[in-house]
Amino acid sequence: MAASLQAAATLMQPTKVGVRNNLQLRSAQSVSKAFGVEQGSGRLTCSLQTEIKELAQKCTDAAKIAGFALATSALVVSGANAEGVPKRLTYDEIQSKTYMEVKGTGTANQCPTIEGGVGSFAFKPGKYTAKKFCLEPTSFTVKAEGVSKNSAPDFQKTKLMTRLTYTLDEIEGPFEVSPDGTVKFEEKDGIDYAAVTVQLPGGERVPFLFTIKQLVASGKPESFSGEFLVPSYRGSSFLDPKGRGGSTGYDNAVALPAGGRGDEEELQKENVKNTASLTGKITLSVTQSKPETGEVIGVFESIQPSDTDLGAKVPKDVKIQGIWYAQLE
């Protein structure tokens, strides 16, 4: 921004007009007045002819417009960079926007927020239906060895390699509030999985399927948790570069005869594709609720396995932290 404002100031500086060599520019009084600058001392006079004065005035006005335009654009750009993520909106505010107002802003990848309400879970005991359940990750870490030699495995910060399409939304399921204050949620339907790829500090990329399929979570509103299903990142019909698949393709790598070297133990995990599902665990916590509208928001932490490349690799633990939103009816 400083560089842009300096460039704007450079454009607004008066320049000498080389029409006649015998003319000397003694004052910038007219230019100063154009910019609203009052001269405190050293009043000078300028003996330019009328046509030269008009030309200088036009140049001054043009430089003024260009300078202010450049300065304004610099402020806009710097403000956008400082803002980072878009402002979090309520559910009604999101619904009131058109497609073009949402497109390219990042709002579609955000869960709604709540205005007002209370800082606890304030719903009466009973059976509800959770709708518009949304989970928005804000952090992805992967358990792996550090960059330094002989470092113990720990959750490492990662860099997101996919687009902003990792939020789960429109999830539905029964939500029960018991008289003792405990809650129970069962995931039944919705956009409950998203393919995500992150990169470790060493450059290794870790794909995984962010999901809460068949989640059954129970406990106090401050911390209710449960296990869920993590399907295989690839389906059984996926073929690897050598044409091998779970339900189709070659049984062994091309040019390796069946019953021979292709069935050796070290190659078995590559030849025999495994599409079995794994399990993950998530813990959710309510931070704010609004009973009059049925809205509730909170934070979550999920630990699930990464992709196994159809059984050829050992999965890594992926920790996902973020916020969630739901409407109870």
UniProtKB/Swiss-Prot annotation:
Localization annotation: Plastid, Chloroplast thylakoid membrane
GO-annotated cellular components: chloroplast thylakoid membrane; photosystem II oxygen evolving complex
Transit peptide (residue range): 1-82
GO MF, one example: oxygen evolving activity
Transmembrane segment boundaries: none
Keywords assigned: Chloroplast, Manganese, Membrane, Photosynthesis, Photosystem II, Plastid, Thylakoid, Transit peptide
SUPFAM superfamilies, per the entry: OMPA-like
InterPro entries per UniProt: OMP/PagP_b-brl (IPR011250), PsbO (IPR002628)
GO terms (BP aspect): photosystem II assembly; photosystem II stabilization
Domain of life, source organism: Eukaryota
Family of this protein: Belongs to the PsbO family.
Role noted for this protein: Stabilizes the manganese cluster which is the primary site of water splitting.
Name assigned to this protein: Oxygen-evolving enhancer protein 1, chloroplastic
Organism this protein belongs to: Solanum lycopersicum
